[in-house]
């Protein structure tokens, strides 16, 4: 029974496509090696897969550059010289751009002005004025950002202060606030550790002796406890 003719077209499934590529690449390289050994031929194969991977084969008796040199000699073309000429032309353009930039920099620093005409000087002044304007705008932008950041920090500090004041006022409403008893352990009263002076805070009537005030009309006064 005759085999059906296989239709050659792109394999849509990516996995199947990669498997087929790998198998046929190995088969092609094997055939190239056999041709190189059996017939003493110089064979070079360069392949790039759909995933941009490079695969190549070169006969053991030669090198890629030698084979390209023989190709150029056989067909009468010089691939390297045309590429070199393009590189030289590109380098020439880059050098011209570099010279112009260096000249503009010197002129903006007040140098190399003798060869400039009136219109060129006017244009240079306009360019420098525009550059100065952009620099000022950038400076003001940076300062504005710093001011906004500082204002945010100030608002955060003010919010923390308000919360502390509210918490302090709320605790002042507690009649037991200011006196720490801790079940008779007076070492836990506000003060310094290691036998230092201990401090006790008492709420006094508003008409007590003025010399006992802590300042600002507050009725919360602290006393040092003696041993």
Swiss-Prot record:
**Disulfide bond positions:** none
Q: Which SMART domains match?
A: MADS
Taxonomically, what lineage is the organism?
A: Eukaryota, Viridiplantae, Streptophyta, Embryophyta, Tracheophyta
Q: Enumerate the subcellular locations listed in this protein's record, separating them with semicolons.
A: Nucleus
List, for all copies, the residue spans of the domain called MADS-box: 3-57
What are the entry keywords? Activator, Developmental protein, DNA-binding, Nucleus, Transcription, Transcription regulation
State a GO cellular component annotated for this protein.
nucleus
Q: Does the keyword Transcription regulation apply?
A: yes
Q: Which GO terms describe its molecular function?
A: DNA-binding transcription factor activity; protein dimerization activity; RNA polymerase II transcription regulatory region sequence-specific DNA binding
State the source organism's domain of life: Eukaryota
| Name of the featured protein | Floral homeotic protein DEFICIENS
Q: Which InterPro entries match?
A: MADS-box/MEF2_TF, MEF2-like_N, TF_Kbox, TF_MADSbox, TF_MADSbox_sf
- K-box domain location is 84-174
Native source organism of the sequence: Antirrhinum majus (Garden snapdragon)
Tell me the GO BP annotations in alphabetical order. positive regulation of transcription by RNA polymerase II
Q: What does this protein do?
A: Transcription factor involved in the genetic control of flower development. Acts in conjunction with GLOBOSA (glo).
Task: Answer yes or no on keyword Transcription.
Answer: yes
What other remark does the UniProt record contain for this protein?
Mutations in defA cause transformation of petals into sepals and stamina into carpels.
